[in-house]
A protein has these predicted regions:
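Bacterial Sec-dependent N-terminal signal peptides
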Residues: 1-30
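Extracytoplasmic cysteine-anchoring/structural motifs
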Residues: 20-343
Length: 343
């Protein structure tokens, strides 16, 4: 199942271009270019957590693109679009209930462009996109651990022809852009929720914290690379399973029969920025579980070293984490498809 965002975007006639100066503007050829922005849904499409619907505000920027250049990442000129109130240098669009939005503006015929699309929840205070070429992540921002408002989607695209090659804008220009999460989603799942409850633990008050080492904090939106490195500690929060109206559990669609369609107590969920390559980047993760919201309520602290985190994948830490310090299994699940990698 896919969610489709419709976006028609371009530079308005009030702006000048290298070959279209202000005094020649009335002679410039402008065309309306239509972009279909597609954000694939999460594998658990019926769930409210991590289904992508919280990323309801779209910000985009338009930059010139030189078809003859070998590097278009050193952009000096932002084609300045103004709408909404997020930042005067970007256009912000609120999607409707069907996750669709349309902006009508124009591009100059015969010019090539590149686009940065960023979709997030407007209430998420953890992303700084004042420079749309370098989006910064604040892991101590307004959104706490286990809160799906951190979910966001990103894409960089260039105007292309029917053969998907970089090209100039022509009449009737249209293009599809696919958004992906630039993050890895880290989840902690308890296989022993029932056993813990039978042993007298009040599973309705379970809280968790998490620390992830060596996390990037800047996304270069023009080439997809990341930079920065910090050890990120997410503050204590109520378990996802207990903090949702539907008492959602972590469901894993794994090829491995031991995990296929099983449900686990969803104790923690966090998004961290990771590189698209190399695909085998590893991080050390520590998470602590509490039967209340104070340090004195600590149950267990678990650590897992060299955990693989992949962009646009979900990494699950699964085990009997509430009743004993035992084996924690690591599963890597590609976020928008129906199979898992288990090791």
């Amino acid at each position: 199942m896919k969610k489709i965002f419709i976006l028609a975007c371009a530079a308005v006639a009030a702006f000048s271009f290298a070959s279209c100066q202000k005094n020649e503007l009335q002679e410039c050829d402008l065309v309306t270019a239509t972009f279909t922005i597609v954000a694939p849904s999460d594998v658990a499409a019926t769930k409210a957590v991590a289904d992508g619907k919280n990323a309801s505000n779209l910000v985009f920027a338009v930059f010139p693109y030189d078809l003859n250049a070998t590097d278009n990442t050193n952009v000096a000129e932002l084609v300045n679009l103004r709408k909404g109130d997020w930042n005067q240098n970007q256009t912000e669009v609120v999607f409707n209930d069907n996750l669709q939005a349309t902006v009508q503006v124009s591009l100059v015929r015969g010019k090539a462009y590149q686009f940065v699309c960023w979709a997030q929840n407007k209430a998420a205070g953890c992303y700084d996109f004042s420079d749309m070429t370098a989006i910064e992540v604040d892991y101590e921002g307004a959104v706490a651990q286990d809160n799906d408002l951190r979910d966001a989607f990103y894409a960089h695209a260039v105007t292309v022809d029917s053969n998907k090659r970089p090209a100039k804008v022509t009449d009737g220009f249209s293009q599809t852009i696919v958004l992906r999460r630039p993050f890895a989603q880290i989840n902690v799942g308890a296989a022993d929720m029932s056993a813990a409850s039978d042993a007298g633990l009040n599973i309705n008050t379970i809280h968790s914290t998490m620390t992830v080492k060596g996390v990037a904090n800047v996304l270069n939106t023009l080439d997809g690379s990341v930079s920065g490195s910090e050890d990120v500690s997410f503050s204590r929060a109520l378990a996802v399973t207990n903090d949702t109206a539907a008492s959602e559990y972590l469901t894993i669609n794994a090829e491995n029969g031991a995990y296929a369609n099983a449900q686990y107590g969803w104790l923690a969920m966090n998004y961290v920025l990771v590189a698209s390559a190399p695909a085998n980047a590893t991080h050390d993760i520590t998470f602590s579980l509490y039967d209340g919201n104070s340090d004195a309520d600590l149950l267990y602290t678990h650590s897992k070293t060299n955990v693989t985190l992949k962009r646009n994948f979900r990494t699950h830490l699964i085990g009997d984490v509430l009743t004993a310090v035992g084996t924690i299994n690591v599963l890597i699940e590609e976020d928008f498809y129906d199979y898992d990698i288990v090791y």
